[in-house]
Amino acid sequence: MEFNANRVDEANAVITATLTKDSIENNLEKVAKQAAKTMNVQGFRKGKVPVAVVKQRYADKLREDAEADGIRKILADGLKLLDIKNSDLIGEPSVTKFDKKDNGDIEVELSVACKPNIDLGDYKSLVPAVKAIEIDIKKIDDRLTEIAQSSAPLEKIARKRAVKDGDFAVIDFEGFVDGVAFDGGKAEKYPLQIGSGSFIPGFEEQVIGMKYEEQKDITVKFPESYQAKDLAGKEAVFKVTLHEIQERAKPELNDEFAQKMLPGQKDVTIDTLRDRVKEQMLAEDKAKYYRDELKPVFLETLVEKINFALPTSVIEQEINYALNNKIRTMTEEEINELKENANKVEDIRNELKEDAVNSVKATFIIDALAKAENVQVSDQEVTQVLYFEAMQMGQNPQDVIKQYQQAGYLPAIKMSMIEEKVISKLLDEKLGK
């Protein structure tokens, strides 16, 4: 059997071999004998089925298995020759050539992707300059006022007037599609905050200007993406009655309010709450500063300065992913043009390649940085983040986590969390110097 194994670079290898007809036939004989031991065939006792019968009935499947055994041996021999461990592989090696010859031989080529060897060098010198975050006292007081207003009780307005933006309009409503009332479209004495965007687009705007006890027909159209499929995209008429207008009571920023917001803590004053809000705002602003300003600069510098070989197959996967996303945004006419012209597809792939290379390179660098900095993210941490986000969106956390698991998104989420964690650690160190 002709055989050749070469390292293209540290991250890629190619193994070529000729799988001879004789070796395939020998493998086929072994596979057939093994199958005969366990196969149930009518007219024969289990384990006593003649090999010739097995070959006759399952010829195609047995030949596929025999060829696969040959490929596995080629791979094993190639990896051994190149001193590549299975733990060094990225994904499954791909069969890039499988050429059946007239004489029964098969010319095989296998492409192997390996974990790259990354020398980070003095990576901490590449961390960008970090400035300390400061919060204006007025912004802190504005946030305190927002918190107080959101928790203040609703009160009926002292003087009757028309509804304006920001009001809580207490309304009765009932919705109809094609003159027929639909489930979930009716409520009484419902406090709708105007401008909250909690109702169907266009509804709240038409409540503005209504007066006490006024009745009005409001016409809106359900979004195409509306969760109730029987209503999605349809026009609806809501019969609305305004009963009263409410607004938040004017909050008092005092020690009593602070004690309500920080229950169970001793000696709480409004200054205690102000300090707590300041800490939260500093953390929020720092996270935004790191994410939006410093992280892109840092990643760009890392990708530019740290060089190493990249696995070709991983880059191709990234290009395929980007290409599929791009196709989803195309019109039917544009997609048909691509189907008719393979060169256009290749042109797009070439356009996407640079970003794909940088993305793959950044991922490997982050992984290496995480190991160097001993940064880890547990499965429990991933679950906690998803749980919290689901609760914020009013969704069932268990359902959301299950959906992410089934879609195979958890590894990507973990990698994203590792990235944020290791970059924040390095930026914090820079800030502290």
Curated annotation (Swiss-Prot):
* Gene source species: Aliarcobacter butzleri (strain RM4018)
| Catalysis: reaction(s) | [protein]-peptidylproline (omega=180) = [protein]-peptidylproline (omega=0)
The kind of enzyme this is, by top-level EC class, is isomerase
This one is known as Trigger factor
* GO biological processes: 'de novo' cotranslational protein folding; cell division; chaperone-mediated protein folding; protein transport; protein unfolding
Pfam families on file:
FKBP_C, Trigger_C, Trigger_N
Which UniProt keywords are present, listed alphabetically? Cell cycle, Cell division, Chaperone, Cytoplasm, Isomerase, Rotamase
GO CC terms, sorted: cytoplasm
Source taxonomy: Bacteria, Pseudomonadati, Campylobacterota, Epsilonproteobacteria, Campylobacterales
